[in-house]
């Protein structure tokens, strides 16, 4: 939803207004988080010691690394983000500026990406595949079509369609991945496994931006 709204704002009002509204949303988010009432942690039983953060990290790593299928997907996803973040954060804006219509075209393209993300979530609610992870991973390569279409570059409507498809694919993958984790990872280990999943998936993203 955010990318869709941002695309509309940038393409109609310009990037300056987009940045201003973005800053405002961060302010609102900060106020909302500040006002959240977080329940106190469960008190320890008499004689029980609180587990150190390093012990929690070790236990989380064991839960994560002992499930090889999770490790393989996270490693693969880390390389996906290595390329995707560099494409979306650097290459796409430069190509749009030099070969197409600048910020307005970028906004329209990102609007398509955002709409695709919404549709991907809707499809994930409707589709009940026997192998959700296979479906999620199978639709990710559509992102390569988006990159190819922009590299040529193809007409804006083609960029819109490929961005839409990428949004659908990425959110289908995310929804099916979360479903698979919650189905096969015990509740008491889920938060720790998810932490290593998030870190591992995004670890190469800054390198993609740098390269």
Where are these regions (language model features)?
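Mid-bilayer segments of alpha-helical transmembrane spans in multi-pass integral membrane proteins
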Residues: 1-4, 31, 175
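Transmembrane alpha-helix termini and helix-breaking/packing motifs in multi-pass membrane transporters
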Residues: 2-23, 93, 98-100, 207-211
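Structural preference for long, well-ordered alpha-helical segments in enzyme cores
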Residues: 4-5, 9, 27, 57, ...
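Alpha-helical transmembrane segments and their lipid-water interface positions
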Residues: 6, 29, 33, 204-208
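Helix-loop junctions on the cytosolic side of multi-pass membrane transporters
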Residues: 15-51, 130
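Short, hydrophobic secondary-structure boundary micro-motifs
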Residues: 36, 42-45, 72-74, 91, ...
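Juxtamembrane intracellular "pre-TM" segments in multi-pass secondary transporters
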Residues: 39-75
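C-terminal transmembrane bundle of multi-pass solute transporters/carriers
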Residues: 58, 65, 79, 85, ...
């Amino acid at each position: 939803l955010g990318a869709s709204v941002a695309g509309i704002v940038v393409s109609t009002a310009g990037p300056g207004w987009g940045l201003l509204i973005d800053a405002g949303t961060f302010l609102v988010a900060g106020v909302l988080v500040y006002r959240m009432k977080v329940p106190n942690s469960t008190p320890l039983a008499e004689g029980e010691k609180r587990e150190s953060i390093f012990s929690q990290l070790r236990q989380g790593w064991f839960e994560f690394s002992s499930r090889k299928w999770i490790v393989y997907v996270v490693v693969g996803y880390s390389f996906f983000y290595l390329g995707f973040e560099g494409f979306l954060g650097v290459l796409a804006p430069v190509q749009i500026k030099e070969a197409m219509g600048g910020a307005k075209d970028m906004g329209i393209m990102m609007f398509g990406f955002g709409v695709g993300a919404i549709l991907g979530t809707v499809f994930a609610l409707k589709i009940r595949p026997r192998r959700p992870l296979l479906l999620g991973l199978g639709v990710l390569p559509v992102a390569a079509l988006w990159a190819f279409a922009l590299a040529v570059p193809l007409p804006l409507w083609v960029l819109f369609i490929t961005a839409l498809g990428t949004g659908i694919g990425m959110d289908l993958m995310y929804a099916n991945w979360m479903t698979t984790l919650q189905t096969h990872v015990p509740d008491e280990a889920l938060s720790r496994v998810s932490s290593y999943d998030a870190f591992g998936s995004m670890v190469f993203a800054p390198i993609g931006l740098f390269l």
